[in-house]
């Protein structure tokens, strides 16, 4: 699985810690991590939580990522922004049990974490435990066991509902403010990470032409 890490500007200084912790957990499982930044608070490409949502939508809908890890100060804004896009099911995780239950019950493809709120001593330990519970036990298996059937049924229903209530990502890219879009994909390593991994020719061609 290809996991993309996105950090918005208010918590950009924590990107190295988050990346290191994520890689420590998921690379031994056979997963790949692509770090889309921000890398420091002074990056030329300033990603807000709204841009983090747009970038998550681009990565997941193009197939350039299978999963997105993002967040903001509280995680709430990033979650809302991510869920405004098609093909993105983003959960808000604050502890390891959230990670396990989101993976098993909701079976989403994106998570938003609080990187300021309650992020003090031992923060990297909590992150490590969250990532282990999120990625270490498969997805969509249900929890508790007696709730597996209705949970899996509801997940399929939610996917069908989102397909109806959201527009195609390529249409959004055409209609969204183009300056905002260009800023979102102007990260230092966006091109080298995104275009080789992109599986949607229309999305890739449109972004490359900007």
What is each stretch, according to the model?
Residues 77-90, 94-95:
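Short Gly/Thr/Asp-enriched flexible loops that form oxyanion-binding sites at enzyme active sites
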Residues 48-67:
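Short, structured active-site "lid" loops
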Residues 38-39, 73-74, 97, 115-118:
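Short, ordered loop/turn segments at secondary-structure junctions
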Residues 15-16, 53, 75-81:
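Short glycine/serine/threonine-rich phosphate/pyrophosphate-binding segments
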Residues 29-46:
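A short beta-strand-loop structural module common to alpha/beta enzyme folds
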Residues 4-17, 100-210:
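C-terminal binding/interaction regions
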Residues 14-29:
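Short, solvent-exposed amphipathic alpha-helices that sit
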Residues 65-71, 90:
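A short, small-residue-rich loop immediately preceding and capping a beta-strand
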């Amino acid at each position: 699985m290809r996991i993309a890490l996105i950090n918005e500007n208010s918590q950009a200084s924590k990107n190295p810690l988050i990346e290191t912790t994520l890689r420590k957990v998921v690379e031994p499982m056979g997963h790949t991590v692509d770090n889309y930044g921000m890398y420091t608070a002074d990056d030329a490409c300033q990603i807000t939580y709204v841009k983090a949502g747009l970038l998550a939508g681009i990565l997941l809908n193009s197939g350039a990522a299978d999963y997105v890890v993002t967040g903001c100060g509280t995680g709430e804004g990033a979650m809302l922004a991510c869920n405004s896009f098609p093909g993105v099911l983003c959960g808000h995780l604050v502890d390891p049990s959230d990670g396990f239950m989101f993976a098993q019950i909701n079976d989403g493809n994106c998570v938003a974490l609080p990187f300021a709120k309650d992020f003090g001593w031992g923060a990297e330990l909590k992150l490590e435990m969250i990532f282990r519970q999120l990625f270490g036990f498969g997805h969509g298996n249900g929890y508790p066991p007696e709730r597996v059937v209705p949970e899996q049924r509801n997940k399929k229903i939610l996917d069908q509902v989102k397909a109806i209530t959201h527009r195609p990502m390529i249409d959004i890219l055409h209609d969204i403010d183009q300056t905002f879009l260009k800023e979102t994909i102007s990260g230092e390593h966006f091109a080298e990470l995104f275009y080789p991994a992109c599986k949607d020719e229309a999305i890739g061609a449109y972004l490359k032409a900007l």
